[in-house]
A protein has these predicted regions:
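Detector for small/aliphatic-rich hydrophobic stretches
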Residues: 1-96, 208, 237-247
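Short acidic, S/G/P-rich loop/turn micro-motifs used as interaction or catalytic elements
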Residues: 71-74, 125-126, 150-155
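Conserved inter-motif catalytic segment of the P-loop NTP-binding fold
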Residues: 38, 91-146
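Phosphate-binding/switch region of NTP-binding enzymes
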Residues: 175-245
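Helical mechanochemical/support elements of P-loop NTPase systems and associated helical scaffolds
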Residues: 46, 76, 104, 129, ...
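A short acidic, amphipathic alpha-helical/loop segment
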Residues: 79-83, 107, 132, 158-162
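Hydrophobic/aromatic ligand-binding patch that stacks against planar heteroaromatic rings
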Residues: 86, 136, 165
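A contiguous pocket-lining binding segment that forms or flanks enzyme active sites
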Residues: 140-183
């Protein structure tokens, strides 16, 4: 196992979706970490209208995605539920670093995302947050890393380290930041701004058209296919959000 990610997992402020040693070993098996996306450069967002506007036809796998919004980004997480559902087939960690809230278990279960794949890390400082994010991305044990950088100021060089880590990995890296950073330059491969409910603006994308606005469907959780497959669970979580505050 990668020593850095092992250190992160062993921290007292890290939570795993299961305490089973067997399940953890299964997820951290690096032998098959690159088997699902060996040559892919992107993964579908799960929204045809958004994929059509992105240069690679989805979220870039070799580069960071920066998501800006006016709140703490918790409501933005529904945007990534379809991708998380797809990545769950890899049986690797889906890692949350510095998240202001915890995943709403009934909802992720309704989406078919195993809770034992969820790894939450709670850094105490910005330096720990940056370090944990880079190490998680560079390891081969995470299919996706969500990192909440918030409204703090980050140097271009600090963000570039994360971008380079993502460029050398098949791990999807999503960085959440405040809209206050909109005027700051960024080295990421894709930058989007969520300025209203389900309204996304593509601010920057390498090799593609920018300043593109997309209105997404109301909620991917309630499409006809999922409703038919998970009718009871969907009904029970219609009013829930993807994330709930940490107790």
């Amino acid at each position: 196992m990668n020593q850095s990610i092992e250190h992160i997992i062993s921290r007292p402020d890290t939570w795993r979706g299961t305490s089973s040693h067997q399940a953890s070993h299964f997820i951290l098996n690096t032998a098959s970490a690159n088997t699902t996306w060996p040559a892919a450069r992107s993964i579908s967002t799960g929204f045809a209208s958004l994929d059509a506007k992105l240069q690679l036809g989805g979220w870039p796998l070799q580069g960071a995605v920066e998501v800006l919004s006016n709140d703490d980004n918790s409501e933005c997480m529904s945007l990534f539920l379809p991708t998380m559902q797809t990545l769950s087939a890899e049986k690797r960690w889906q890692t949350f670093i510095g998240a202001p809230h915890t995943p709403y278990a009934p909802l992720i279960q309704a989406m078919g995302i195993p809770s034992e794949q969820i790894l939450m890390v709670h850094p105490k400082t910005r330096e720990e947050l940056l370090w944990a994010t880079e190490q998680a991305v560079r390891s081969t044990t995470c299919s996706v890393v969500f990192a909440w950088l918030g409204s703090a100021h980050y140097r271009y060089a600090e963000l570039r380290k994360l971008q380079l880590a993502a460029a050398d990995s098949d791990t999807l890296l999503i960085i959440f930041r405040s809209s206050d950073a909109l005027s700051a330059s960024t080295p990421v491969s894709l930058r989007v701004h969520i300025d209203a409910y389900r309204e996304i603006s593509v601010i920057k994308q390498r090799g593609g058209k920018s300043e593109v606005a997309i209105r997404l469907p109301d909620n991917p959780l309630f499409d006809s296919n999922l409703a038919a497959r998970e009718k009871t669970k969907v009904t029970a979580t219609r009013t829930g959000t993807y994330l709930i505050p940490v107790a």
